[in-house]
Design a protein with these regions (language model features):
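Flexible phosphate-sensing "switch/lid" loops adjacent to ATP/NTP-binding sites
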Residues: 1-553
Length: 553
């Protein structure tokens, strides 16, 4: 059966029963139908005195077009922990419509390990991303309206972009204000995908409604003739924006196919944003369960680095264990094996490609000082010889491997890794950051480039040099760094899979995200508004006369 058929043939518990598993009272949930709910932000305050449960971060090797199944493994682990009698909860990001209709498809797991209702989650869900889009574009409208009625704040340059939760390359650069009306000034504008909007980052890093409003007010939207920043609070827009986000800030409660609770909230990409679910969801989950399973987007060089260097730095969170998801297909792909031959047994290909996995392990274990286990997401084409070869190679580096068969067996396919994680999460670790707050922007970028990306050096465009100088002059040089680059390689070139230490990271631009509290560094040719592939997933998605959706995977 397909993923969507498996999901449709599974009887879900009503959402109030899932809430009961977490000891959440009925008055603290707002139901969106039978199987979805918002939970009150007061739940964290009510449980604040409780000790935190264990935090397990799931990341992966560098992703490939084949898909590694990070979300699938995350769900399997949560279900597996429940199978061995542990109280577990998932905290995941919400899918964006861009990938759903683009190249990646849905983001709710697969096979017997999915979060549900999968069609709802993959599409509009509870409207959080639409609310962010509305708040973002309300701000854009208010900026242009302010300029239209006299420009009292003296906008000389507008840096705030409009957004849309779809992949649409035509909107990367547009000209607005072409109506010909005398008071409307035409200008070049840009669109980001909504999940790259600073408002998404702000929502995911806010501790509560008050903090959300304050962070929104601190967003820089433009500069005057003196090159001084203009903030949202000067436009008096943060109140209306917060009103639009008053429900979006509340975490969404759903379930796995095996009825494990899941908080699915926030959805920044890890290649062009910070790639983590909301702070509110993670902190709440830690009070409600013994084990919180969360994931960070793409490979450990992107999502995990940002989870650790940005989210943990800002919140004081610290993972008790880290899972690095790998597949034999992906290892062979990084070893240069062609996609057409990827399912054939190939020890030589594994030998060449396993270095990618080694680097991610080294980053998490030695650079960040955290305990690591590798989850091998098993496919039918994997051979015992290949599995044993990888297991032996990792054993030589004192790294444990667990074969996960969640897709085929559900939580039963993750009992081994669940037991191992219980033990691993009890061991002490020596968590540390890659850079210090006191480092300059360039020092932070260089430390990430050398330690995490294995680069030789960092090269800057003239524009990037000037932008860094201006950011530090304004007093924001101590903020964390969020590098936006390709997910397919340690480098900024998606085709450079070998990534020997003789290449440079090329920085073309730097953007201050003062509301979110970090500096975005644009490396290589990464775009904050993706485009659709030649054959988008949208072509296969349909609905029949009975309202049954097909084609979401």
């Amino acid at each position: 059966m397909t993923d969507i058929e498996i999901a449709k043939n599974t009887k879900l518990d009503e959402i109030n029963k899932i809430a009961e598993k977490l000891e959440i009272k009925e008055e603290d949930i707002e139901q969106y139908g039978k199987y979805k709910a918002k939970i009150s932000n007061e739940i964290y305050e009510k449980n604040k005195s409780k000790n935190n449960g264990k935090l397990i971060l799931v990341t992966a090797i560098s992703p490939t077009p084949l898909g590694e199944g990070k979300t699938t493994v995350s769900i399997a682990i949560a279900d597996g922990l429940r199978k061995i009698g542990k109280k577990s909860i998932l905290t995941l990001r919400e899918p964006s419509l861009g990938p759903v209709f683009g190249i990646k498809g849905g983001a709710t797991g697969g096979g017997k390990v999915q979060i549900a209702p999968m069609e709802d989650i993959n599409l509009h869900f509870t409207g959080d991303i639409h609310a962010i889009t509305s708040a973002n574009n309300l701000l854009s409208a208010m900026i242009d309206n302010h300029i239209y009625f006299g420009n009292e704040l003296g906008f000389e340059k507008v840096v705030w972009k409009r957004c849309l939760d779809l992949n649409d390359r035509q909107l990367r650069k547009v000209e607005t204000g072409l109506s010909g009306e005398s008071k409307i000034v035409p200008r070049i504008d840009n669109f980001d995908i909504t999940v790259a909007s600073e408002i998404m980052a702000v929502l995911c890093l806010a501790e509560n409604l008050k903090d959300l409003k304050q962070k929104l007010g601190n967003i820089i939207i433009g500069y005057n003739k003196k090159e001084e920043p203009i903030y949202v609070k000067q436009l008096k827009a943060e109140g209306a924006m917060t009103v639009l986000l008053k429900d979006a800030i509340k975490p969404n409660l759903v379930q796995t196919l095996e009825h494990t609770p899941a908080l699915v909230h926030g959805g920044p990409f890890a290649n062009i944003a910070h790639g983590c679910n909301s702070v509110i969801a993670t902190k709440t989950a830690l009070k409600l369960a013994d084990y919180t399973i969360t994931e960070a987007g793409f490979g450990a060089d992107l999502g995990a680095e940002k989870f650790l260097d940005i989210k943990c730095r800002k919140t004081g969170l610290k993972p008790d264990a880290v899972v690095i998801v790998a597949t034999i297909k992906a290892i062979k792909y990084h070893g240069g094996v062609e996609k057409e031959k990827i399912q054939e047994e190939n020890i030589e290909g594994i030998e060449k490609g396993i270095d990618n996995l080694y680097k991610h392990i080294d980053n998490i274990k030695n650079k960040f000082g955290l305990n690591v286990i590798v989850a091998l997401n098993k496919y039918a084409s994997d051979t015992e010889k290949e599995i044993e070869y990888i297991k032996e190679k990792l054993a030589n580096k004192n790294i444990e491997l667990s074969v996960v068969e969640g897709w085929a067996k559900g939580g039963d396919g993750a009992i081994d890794i669940a037991n191992k994680l219980v033990k691993l999460s009890q061991q002490p670790n020596e968590f540390k950051y890659i850079y210090n707050d006191s480092d300059s922007i360039k020092e932070k970028i260089l430390k990430i480039a050398k330690n995490i990306y294995y680069a030789k050096d960092v090269k800057y465009s003239e524009e990037a040099e000037k932008q860094i100088e201006n950011i530090e002059k304004m007093g924001y040089g101590k903020l964390p760094i969020c590098i936006a680059k390709t997910q397919y390689s340690f480098s900024d070139d998606p085709k450079n899979l070998e990534c020997k230490d003789d290449y440079n990271i090329n920085v073309r631009g730097v953007e201050l995200k003062n509301g979110a509290g970090f500096v975005v560094v644009l490396a290589g040719k990464i775009m904050t508004m993706p485009g659709l592939p030649k054959v988008p997933a949208a072509e296969s998605i349909d609905i029949d006369e009975d309202g049954e959706i097909v084609g979401i995977f």
